[in-house]
Amino acid sequence: MNWRSERIWIELITGSRKTSNFFWACILFLGSLGFLLVGTSSYLGRNLISLFPSQQILFFPQGIVMSFYGIAGLFISSYLWCTIWWNVGSGYDQFDRKEGIVCIFRWGFPGRNRRIFLRFLMRDIQSIRIEVKEGLYPRRVLYMEIRGQGALPLTRIDENLTPREIEQKAAELAYFLRVPIEVF
């Protein structure tokens, strides 16, 4: 959801609470739980999962390896669930032409730097930059070039914008901020 008026432009950024992250976290959790159960059932010599007979899987080396993969998968799955729970990467971009201030806010991981808040003056913005890399894995990223700060990404790398969409977004933002567009 975005909100724009003549003087203020607010763009909400979706973080890690995306459908694909939920999907992969569920798949990884269920798969690693299955591996751990098969490894445990081969150790105990009993069937914990009725789909696989545990007598066919020896504990050494297959059961140990499956248990290791199950534990590793549970750790990775818990990491994914934590990023979803904390909504890492979400936030907003606020461009206020009336005050001449740009505010960029993102949620990070818990700790001292959980809230990432950048604030700078509009007159420090040099340009809006589009970086395009074509090929097998095309990448189109929109940056804001800031004097003394470098380039600040405004779109996510995994956001698959078409060339038309990224040009449209860059043109609208450059027009709103009254800065030039650079293409790399």
UniProtKB/Swiss-Prot annotation:
- Record flagged with keyword Membrane: yes
Q: What is this protein called?
A: Photosystem I assembly protein Ycf4
Instruction: Name the predominant localization.
Output: plastid
Q: Which PANTHER family match?
A: PHOTOSYSTEM I ASSEMBLY PROTEIN YCF4, PTHR33288
Protein topology in the membrane = Multi-pass membrane protein
* Subcellular locations according to the entry: Plastid, Chloroplast thylakoid membrane
Q: What does this protein do?
A: Seems to be required for the assembly of the photosystem I complex.
Keywords from UniProt, A to Z, are: Chloroplast, Membrane, Photosynthesis, Plastid, Thylakoid, Transmembrane, Transmembrane helix
Please verify whether the record's keywords include RNA-binding: no
Task: Write down the HAMAP family for this protein, in alphabetical order.
Answer: Ycf4
Q: Which GO terms describe its cellular component?
A: chloroplast thylakoid membrane; photosystem I
Which parts pass through the membrane?
A: 22-42, 57-77
Which GO biological process annotations does it have? Answer: photosynthesis
What family is reported?
A: Belongs to the Ycf4 family.
Which InterPro entries does this entry report, sorted A to Z?
A: PSI_Ycf4_assembly
